[in-house]
């Protein structure tokens, strides 16, 4: 599995994505990713990256959404992900392991997390102002993202989640950094398309 091998922009993108949308189950023996079908492309990219023969299956979840999922069964993978705090029931406790992420790969990790638990938007009611937000059940995680991206806005609590929101021209500068080393395989197309619209 490439994720267990040497450091790369691709590897840390996927670690960031798994920090958001990865679910470690069966006492660390299984990794599951389940996404709405509009994100099916990213599941296929992940499967290719992992060099996995696992099947991607479809279902309708309890909310009536059409979803696709992939399960990868590997205790070795589970142990490795635990080194990056990607463990069972991480929603409220996850912390970005900054000491394990070289500076040159931090934006890749953030991009992965953004594709999982972030949002890029164009506020048409505000003269097409770009906005960027991150949400997590872990306040510490959002505080770390705030510091890494040097965002001065305060963090807001919404129910059980914490929200970091930024809008305005500075969003373009932030996204430029986040997407600097991205490739077609390491970015969610629908979010990247919004970024491309913003910078036109």
Tell where the protein language model's regions lie, with residue ranges.
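Internal intein/HINT superfamily modules and their associated LAGLIDADG
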Residues: 1-200
